[in-house]
């Protein structure tokens, strides 16, 4: 098996989870070349000639084919040092009193976090003194005790398991953050199918 695979993943998850698996896959298949494009935005698979995307959440484009890789959810969390100095929120509205570490919309310095409250969807506007378009930067700021983040639990599962980050608002449902392997239509390349199978086997939820 030989040839290229062009793929995309979110920046933080791509660095911490996907890149090491690429190393393992290429040890098994040294004639394959993998190009990994990291972006927290949505990449057009057809326009950018991408074979495979790892994406979170439900898919809006029905023309894309998706395979569920991991079930995930978004969580609100902060370091124990932050919670020691700031009362943990009991309701999403309480986030207005917290320094929220924001992954902004283009041209904005705030973000909107979504919850389900008493069966109704609720969107809460949050803001803080640190803004970044890189999930890894936001994660590190949270670990350093600078504020509260909302992240896919899959991206920070090691930090949650170790207690380096502690969740809040767990009784409020957040949006779907399942991880999917997405392709533009049917996958014709054997190497892409083999790589997706490899990821499905090795991206194991803790």
For the regions a protein language model found, what residue spans apply to each?
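Flexible hinge/capping segments at coil-to-helix
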Residues: 63-74, 78-103, 118
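Ligand-binding "clamshell"
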Residues: 61-66, 159-169
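Ligand-binding cleft/hinge of the Venus flytrap
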Residues: 7, 25, 111-125, 157
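Hydrophobic residues within well-ordered alpha-helices
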Residues: 95, 141-145, 160
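C-terminal effector-binding regulatory domain of bacterial HTH transcription factors
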Residues: 31, 153-164, 172-206
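Central regulatory/effector-binding core of bacterial HTH transcription factors
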Residues: 2-65
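Short beta-strand-to-loop elements that line the ligand-binding cleft
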Residues: 34-38, 123-134, 172
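Paired acidic/hydrophobic, glycine-rich loop segments that form the ligand-binding mouth/hinge
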Residues: 52-55, 147-151
């Amino acid at each position: 098996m030989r040839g290229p695979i062009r793929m995309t993943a979110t920046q933080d998850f791509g660095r911490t989870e996907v890149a090491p698996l690429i190393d393992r896959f290429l040890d098994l298949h040294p004639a394959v070349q993998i190009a990994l494009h990291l972006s927290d935005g949505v990449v057009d698979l057809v326009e950018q000639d991408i074979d495979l995307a790892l994406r979170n959440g439900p898919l809006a484009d029905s023309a894309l084919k998706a395979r569920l890789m991991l079930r995930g959810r978004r969580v609100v969390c902060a370091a124990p040092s932050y919670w020691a100095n700031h009362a943990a929120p009991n309701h999403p509205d309480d986030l207005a009193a917290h320094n929220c570490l924001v992954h902004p919309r283009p041209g904005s310095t705030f973000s909107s976090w979504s919850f389900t409250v008493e069966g109704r969807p609720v969107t809460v506007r949050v803001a803080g003194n640190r803004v970044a378009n890189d999930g890894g930067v936001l994660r590190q700021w949270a670990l350093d005790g600078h504020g509260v983040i909302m992240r896919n639990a899959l991206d920070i599962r090691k930090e949650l398991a170790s207690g380096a980050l502690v969740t809040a608002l767990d009784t409020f449902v957040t949006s779907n953050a399942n991880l999917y392997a997405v392709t533009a239509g049917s996958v014709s390349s054997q190497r892409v199918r083999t790589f997706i199978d490899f990821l499905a086997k090795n991206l194991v939820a803790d």
